């Protein structure tokens, strides 16, 4: 009986050891391709919001308790622009991540939405090329926009950023992430002290109640301008 128990223990130990070795080997094999894919995705995102560059230096700031990374891009030793990897947790479907490009003097070059889980056909349009949100900021210096308490805001909240049709919550979240990127850009480019960006993405009480009584496809549809 004792011998059988020892044999079973030895077998189980051997199986566990082999399984652990197998998992470790798989991790070693897949780690490099995953890292390469992540780097390729980041390079593509930077290329999408910056002019030609050959080097970047990254600096991560904390704004609203979130990590916001600023990439200072140079070409031939000359400043080419800044790319800011920004985010918000206040999208209708959760977190939204984006890359925002700025010229050295603060003009928005482009915005590339990297991750979002908004309502298909409504909030997801923020990732479309030439959508109304992007048109409201691209090629412009944000300090020259109609600001509310020093920040960008959608028209419904007193600003001049056009919101996506029937997707006010998503639009507010997009603008919040842009504001956070702008704050980070100013901190790195001009030395301004970064301050938290008060959320404009949380819906008003009436908006929330309207969403809760709507069907899945109509949830953001209840937020018509």
Predicted features along the sequence, with ranges:
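Flexible, solvent-exposed loop/hinge segments and secondary-structure transition points
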Residues: 2-225
């Amino acid at each position: 009986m004792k011998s059988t128990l020892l044999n079973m223990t030895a077998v189980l130990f051997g199986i566990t050891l082999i399984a652990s070795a197998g998992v470790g080997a798989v991790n070693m094999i897949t780690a490099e391709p995953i890292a390469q894919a992540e780097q390729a995705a980041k390079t593509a995102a930077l290329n999408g919001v910056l002019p030609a560059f050959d080097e970047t230096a990254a600096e991560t700031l904390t704004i609203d308790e979130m990590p916001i990374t600023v990439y200072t891009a140079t070409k031939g030793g000359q400043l080419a622009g800044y790319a800011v990897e920004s985010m918000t947790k206040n999208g209708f479907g959760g977190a939204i991540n984006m890359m925002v490009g700025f010229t050295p003097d603060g003009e928005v070059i482009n915005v590339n939405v990297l991750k979002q889980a908004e309502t298909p056909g409504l909030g997801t349009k923020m990732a479309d090329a030439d959508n109304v949100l992007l048109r409201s900021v691209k090629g412009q210096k944000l300090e020259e926009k109609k600001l509310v308490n020093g920040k960008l805001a959608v028209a419904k909240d007193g600003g001049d950023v056009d919101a996506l049709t029937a997707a006010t919550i998503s639009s507010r979240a997009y603008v919040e992430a842009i504001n956070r990127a702008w704050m980070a850009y100013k901190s790195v480019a001009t030395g301004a002290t970064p301050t938290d960006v008060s959320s404009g993405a949380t819906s008003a009480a009436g908006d929330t109640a309207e969403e809760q009584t709507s069907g899945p496809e109509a949830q953001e549809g209840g937020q018509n301008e």
